[in-house]
């Protein structure tokens, strides 16, 4: 029997490379569909953030007409409870998101700032309406030109006043950002092992400063 050796020609049209197809291992595909492949730390963060974004407890702080639109989102027509944010709290210590709906006056600014400081971590702020975003049409001495001058804001909802759908979209944007945050853990796990950092509460850390204060600030100061 005679054998003929033919040199491979990559430019030949017998089996061009662009038409070649690869077949995945069926066992590997089945494992990837049914087994979670990843680090335990990422799984913990994603699970905690999923629970956080679906259990936002807002602190209702309405200062103007935007609060009427905010209250409308709680009705059956818009049903804010679909997003887990219908549990309105009357105390900042039980809330984790502040919705500033309306005009922020200079007299009200210290109150907003004090209530924000009383909220527990993690906490977020939604600025609802043109007045809360930038002062709106009230460019006068008695109106703060944007609530972000006194507290940090995570989401701005435009409008005068914004429709309930706009507030719901802003809430969804906040939920999307929460899923990407890193959860502050009391116990850390890394390559060196498991350790628990000494995290002093903010209240205890500033206790000496509070005791040392002799001249309290006036209620109308920022």
UniProtKB/Swiss-Prot annotation:
Q: Which organism is it from?
A: Psychrobacter cryohalolentis (strain ATCC BAA-1226 / DSM 17306 / VKM B-2378 / K5)
Under PROSITE patterns, the record lists: COMPLEX1_20K
According to UniProt, the reaction catalysed is: a quinone + NADH + 5 H(+)(in) = a quinol + NAD(+) + 4 H(+)(out)
The GO molecular function terms of this record are: 4 iron, 4 sulfur cluster binding; iron ion binding; NADH dehydrogenase (ubiquinone) activity; NADH:ubiquinone reductase (non-electrogenic) activity; quinone binding
Listed disulfide bonds for this chain? Answer: none
Query: Which cellular components does GO assign to this protein?
Result: plasma membrane; respiratory chain complex I
Summarize where [4Fe-4S] cluster binds, as residue positions. Answer: 65-66, 131, 160
The broad enzyme category this protein falls into is translocase
Q: According to the record, how does the cofactor bind?
A: Binds 1 [4Fe-4S] cluster.
How would you describe this protein's topology in the membrane?
Peripheral membrane protein
Its GO biological process annotations read: aerobic respiration; electron transport coupled proton transport
What Pfam families does the record tag this protein with?
Oxidored_q6
Q: Which branch of life, at top level? A: Bacteria
Q: What is its EC number?
A: 7.1.1.-
What is the protein name for this chain? NADH-quinone oxidoreductase subunit B
